[in-house]
């Protein structure tokens, strides 16, 4: 007997407009009414995936960062695979030699080494154009997108300040880099 259905989010549940179609939503609701558990697997972080699913009133388990973290329907973390703490300083040193922003996804949420203004510029000049290229049929409100990213990020002047808070690091995502 089937007890759990697992689905990818991007390109599977989400259509080319990055939306869940009415037909797919009805199927999800029917599955859940039958008592089957639904697990959404995504490369996205938990907060972005949860926000999207909440917009469609879908309550389910979420495996984010490609399965590195798993959360239940209540938002409780069931599993996490972190980057070993002893490796983080060297990684930050290497990434710090690159002329780009990088996003550090941790138990504190999204962390950025640098200023809000610099990160906003990075989002505007690199991330938004890349999203528009990848999803040409999707309408993206650049100002809202950037404001939301800035509101949800924690900013640090350097890696030592971040590491002094002892967060568990899940993923470090580096932008287009020009390393020295």
Name these PLM-found stretches.
Residues 1, 57-59, 168:
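Short loop/turn motifs at secondary-structure junctions
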Residues 1-2, 33:
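Short, Lys/Arg-enriched, disordered terminal segments
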Residues 2-18, 91:
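Asp-based phosphoryl-transfer active-site loop
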Residues 12-19, 132-149:
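An N-terminal domain-start capping segment
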Residues 22-131, 136-137:
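Active-site phosphate-binding/coordination module
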Residues 138-170:
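Alpha-helix-centered segments that form part of catalytic cores
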Residues 173:
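Active-site rim beta-loop-alpha module in soluble metabolic enzymes
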Residues 177-179:
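Conserved small/polar residues in nucleotide/adenosyl-binding loops
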């Amino acid at each position: 007997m089937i007890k759990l259905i697992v689905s990818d989010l991007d390109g599977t549940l989400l259509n080319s407009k990055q939306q869940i179609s009415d037909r797919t939503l009805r199927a999800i609701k029917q599955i859940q009414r039958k008592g089957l558990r639904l697990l959404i697997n995504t490369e996205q972080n938990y907060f972005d995936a949860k926000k999207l699913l909440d917009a469609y009133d879908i309550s389910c388990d979420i495996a984010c960062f490609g399965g590195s973290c798993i959360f239940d329907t209540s938002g409780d973390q069931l599993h996490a695979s972190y980057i070993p703490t002893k490796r983080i300083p060297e990684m930050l040193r290497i990434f710090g030699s690159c002329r780009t922003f990088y996003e550090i996804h941790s138990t504190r949420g999204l962390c950025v080494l640098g200023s809000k203004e610099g990160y906003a510029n990075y989002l505007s000049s690199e991330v938004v154009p890349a999203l528009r290229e990848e999803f040409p049929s999707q309408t993206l409100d650049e100002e809202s997108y950037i404001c939301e990213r800035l509101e949800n990020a924690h900013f640090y002047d350097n890696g030592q300040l971040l590491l002094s808070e002892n967060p568990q690091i899940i993923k470090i995502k580096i932008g287009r880099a020009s390393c020295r």
